[in-house]
Amino acid sequence: MAQVLPVEITEELKQSFINYAMSVIVDRALPDVRDGLKPVQRRILFGAYQEGVLPGRKHVKSAKIVGEVMGKYHPHGDAAIYDALVRMAQPWNLRYPLIDGQGNFGSIDGDPPAAQRYTEARLSPIGAEMLLDIDKDTVDFRPNYDGSLKEPEVLPAAIPNLLVNGASGIAVGMATSLPPHNLSEVVDALVAMIENPAITLEEVMRHLPGPDFPTGGKLSKKGIKEAYATGRGSLKVRAKVRVEEKGQRPVLVVTEIPYQVNKASLIAQIAALVKAKKIEDIVGLRDESDRQGLRIAIELKRGANPQVVLNQLYKHTALQTSFTVNLLAIVDGEPKVLSLLDLMRHYLDHRKEVVRRRSLFELRKAEERAHVLEGLLIALDHIDEVIALIRGSEDAPKARIALMERFGLSEAQAQAILDMRLQRLVALEREKLLEEYRGLMEEIARLKAILEDEARLLAEVKADLLRVKEKYGDARRTLITEFEETFNPEDLIEDEPMVITLTAQGFLKRLPLESYRAQGRGGKGLLAGRTKEEDEATHVFVADAHDDLLLFTNRGRVYRLKVYELPEMGRQARGVHVKSLLPLAEDEEVAALLSVRGLDQEGYLVFATERGLVKRTALKEYQNLGQAGLIAIRLQEGDRLVGVALSDPEDEAILATQEGQAIRFPLEEVRATGRDTQGVIGVRFKKPEDRVVSLVVVKPGEMVDLLSVSTRGYGKRTPLSEYPLQGRGGMGVITYAVSTKVGRLAALLKVRGGEDLLVLSRRGLAIRTPVAEIRQYSRATAGVRVMNLPEDDEVASAFVVEEEK
């Protein structure tokens, strides 16, 4: 009679949940450390083996295998069994598939497989290796779910499946994620451990440097050793991409993608980024994969930088992913996080036990056969007497007893004599039996040595591993390399030339140099920026996007921005106010700009002020330039910076004034001082209202011209050799013939002849013209028209655009 026991619901929930959790952990989601299989996978392989669906035989319907497994060993849904079977057949999921599938088993695009009634399957050769010697009492069996049959607790696993195919699974409160590896490398590492049980992780990694994913790709070295040592970690995996040319356009060709990435989803992800204009240089995207292999073609704009686009794709798409490592497996019925060395030792212990039990089984069989052969040989030695004894017996049992009593035979030996065919009585057959017996005795001796000697046992394990490597070993697919796992902004932004403009009211912007097309000398120019009527452009120059932009203020402070941090806008846009980018005081404004590639280089900064002062300070003094800025120069009341340039100790400086005067002197006359200093006199003015407009730094004897640009848009080139070297502090010589027609000097620039000149007016017009079109004149001349300006406009700034190399 049934008995009802009252139980606290909290206690029942607690106990039931623990039972459920342990069932999921041990019997469903986590692999056994010995064969690397979950129960459903083990049952599928064993069910296929029992059905005789072996390599070399014909495929059978997947539904037949699923039904066999479900009915005999795994009383759960057929969908779960079929899903597990399909995954073991997918070469993009398993490094070494255990099932050989025929038909539609899905795709790397995430397409579902055909129904089980349409597909066919059989064990793959490697799958069969998992069951090798299972008929030799190598593993323990247990009753199936209803006690009607026996199923293996673990497979013999001649293949180190957990290491080569990895595993993934989510249990209750824990999850496992083991990466796949290359079989040849795993075997080499296991052999090294057999030869040196005290082997270190570093020594193992000489043979097994890292995971080897079925889809190939690139794997970062960073994190591999830590994951192997602790059992936990994260590895960065990238697609393999090469650059091809199609016409004049670069094409990124993806040939391998990261493990467990859905190709169709990846392509959709890239397309979405292009549509959202997060990546702007992609003009075409095609999936060109076929039976020859995976191929995704990403066509770029003409002139685009493939590496920058690739870095953007790595950052924003699954072309770069993280593989989480959690080496969790079932050990003696309990889940444990293991190191790589632990995994290897557990597998070797399992194989030692399998080989020991196999040897014991084979020894027993060999001894039984040798025992029978001994009886047969005795019978052949007394064949006439044996025949007479058998003929004289009433029946077989009495004949067996008579043989046992007469020759001291066992029942098995006597029965074997009775079962012997007459043809074995010939002399040749006796020789064959003797040969077989001698062979058996050698085999028995070998098997006993294996069982008695640990070294011989390990040698047998090693031989099995080397056989597997010889038969199934292949080349590594995943390239282990070093790459930056995270991206700096520079990695995602093309290092292209940018035009930087700053207005009198402090509006700053950048736009690509290619926006300014070259025009002939004397043109009207293009609108470069919309300014308010009272606003004027004061600075324009060209710098690369990755350069450091140093901004010097009227208070003598310096700030730093990356050029790419400036807002990129169209030619007619005003820009963003500099105070939204820098922590400037209320009455502080930018007075001079300079671009450098890093502040840790040798050299000096040369400063020139409007009142003719000049100062020299080592560039390294500004290395600690942070968000808050630094003091760059101490300015006198009413004075302001007009120019800053990089220099070497042996260089010379030229200061040019708006009234057309210029002085050239060696910079060694300007003693290098600290940041918070004022400087010394560089030039004296003929007219009190004159002021310095340009600072030029040249090398001694440099074969260059000095290009003068006036406020009314006139210009000329004059050889540097026409400017005598003087001592600093003088009035210099005439460099430009100023007049009402041509205006005053706006800028003096160093040119070689192959560059372009970029001129910006106060009303926002800009012109870019080849320097070679501007003729050479002597110092005391005005030159030719460079830019045709309206009466109410004048040149604000000019800059030389270096020739492309």
From Swiss-Prot:
Keywords: ATP-binding, Cytoplasm, DNA-binding, Isomerase, Nucleotide-binding, Topoisomerase. The keyword Transport does not apply. GO terms for cellular component: chromosome; cytoplasm; DNA topoisomerase type II (double strand cut, ATP-hydrolyzing) complex. Residues 30-492 form the Topo IIA-type catalytic domain. Optimum temperature is 65 degrees Celsius. Active between 25 and 77 degrees Celsius. A motif (GyrA-box) lies at residues 519-525. One of its GO terms (molecular function) is DNA binding. It comes from the Bacteria. It is found in: Cytoplasm. GO terms for biological process: DNA topological change; DNA-templated DNA replication. It is an enzyme of class 5 (isomerase). PROSITE patterns: TOPO_IIA. The keyword Cytoplasm applies. A type II topoisomerase that negatively supercoils closed circular double-stranded (ds) DNA in an ATP-dependent manner to modulate DNA topology and maintain chromosomes in an underwound state. It probably also catalyzes the interconversion of other topological isomers of double-stranded DNA rings, including catenanes. Relaxes negatively supercoiled DNA in an ATP-independent manner. At comparable concentrations T.thermophilus gyrase does not introduce as many negative supercoils into DNA as the E.coli enzyme. Negative supercoiling favors strand separation, and DNA replication, transcription, recombination and repair, all of which involve strand separation. Type II topoisomerases break and join 2 DNA strands simultaneously in an ATP-dependent manner. Heterotetramer, composed of two GyrA and two GyrB chains. The two subunits form an intertwined dimer where the GyrB ATPase transducer helix of 1 subunit connects to the Toprim domain of the other GyrB subunit through a 10 residue linker. In the heterotetramer, GyrA contains the active site tyrosine that forms a transient covalent intermediate with the DNA, while GyrB binds cofactors and catalyzes ATP hydrolysis. For the electron microscopy studies a GyrB-GyrA fusion protein was made with a Gly-Asp-Leu linker between the 2 subunits. It forms the expected dimer. Belongs to the type II topoisomerase GyrA/ParC subunit family. This is DNA gyrase subunit A. The lineage of its organism: Bacteria, Thermotogati, Deinococcota, Deinococci, Thermales.
